[in-house]
């Protein structure tokens, strides 16, 4: 009989493998979805990517912004862009990759680049004006 692993053991192996293979911070482009803040100030959200032709989802990941980061990041982003930090906007975020045995894969946000969102807003504005 083959050696077996419990689900927890397998998930722990996945966590250790990800920690070794993806130890750094990464800048990731994505759209925000399902942004919500809990009573302790942590922000939980989904990052999504859609196919530009069909608008169908092609990638999704859970995200977390811990309260100590979110307290600084949200006002910085909103003041820089004039845009609420909410679902439906495209962002460039610096993340670390995490995997928890119980909660699975997620991205933890460390920073945000508001100039990326400003560029996307300007591009969308130009498209609307062109259609008029």
What are the roles of these predicted feature ranges?
Residues 1-132:
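Acidic, two-metal ion nucleic-acid-processing modules in DNA metabolism proteins
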